[in-house]
Regions:
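Short beta-to-alpha transition helix within the HATPase_c
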Residues: 1-15, 21, 71
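Conserved short strand/loop->alpha-helix "switch" segment adjacent to the catalytic nucleotide/phosphoryl-transfer site
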Residues: 17-50, 54-65
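Short beta-strand/loop element within the Bergerat-fold HATPase_c
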Residues: 63-76
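Glycine-rich/acidic phosphate-handling loop/turn and adjacent ATP-lid/helix
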Residues: 76-101
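Short C-terminal beta-strand
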Residues: 81, 123-133
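Two-component histidine kinase transmitter core
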Residues: 87, 112, 130-135
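Glycine-rich ATP-binding loops of the HATPase_c
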Residues: 111-119
């Protein structure tokens, strides 16, 4: 999963290099092997979150940073954490059903996961879902 996320980030950085060249990524990703179904859904969610941060979060941020983390607990629950140090999002903006939010919702449902957005020195996203037997 770590190498997949690195490739994904490199592709997104190349696409948006003209918008924010100071952007730094912090990865805290356990060695996790996921099936293509899980990896694709997480990749799509990650892409939407990073794209949103790059486009909207860092206008007033001198040293923009995005943190991405994955961990699995003893109950086989994968937790995906995403945060940026941008300007955050007003609660009412999180309720809007723009395309990015719909995609995040669709892929989270595909994973049968529970997710939440919140502000904590920027936008934060947390997704929990159970890795089914034989599909990790």
């Amino acid at each position: 999963m770590f190498s997949y996320i690195n490739v994904l980030i490199a592709s997104i950085e190349e696409t948006f290099s003209n918008l924010n060249s100071n952007l730094k990524f912090e990865l805290n990703v356990e060695k996790i092997n996921l099936s293509p179904i899980y990896a694709n859904a997480i990749g799509m969610i990650t892409t939407e979150l990073i794209t949103n941060s790059i486009k909207h979060a860092f206008q007033d941020t001198s040293y923009p940073k995005i943190a991405i983390g994955f961990s699995i607990n003893e109950d086989n629950v994968l937790t995906f954490l995403y945060s940026d140090n941008g300007n955050g999002v007003a609660d009412f903006d999180l309720l809007k059903k723009n395309l990015g939010m719909r995609l995040i919702s669709i892929f989270s449902r595909q994973l049968e996961g529970d997710y939440q957005f919140y502000n904590d020195n920027g936008l934060c996203f947390k997704l929990n879902f159970v890795l089914k037997n034989g599909k990790s």
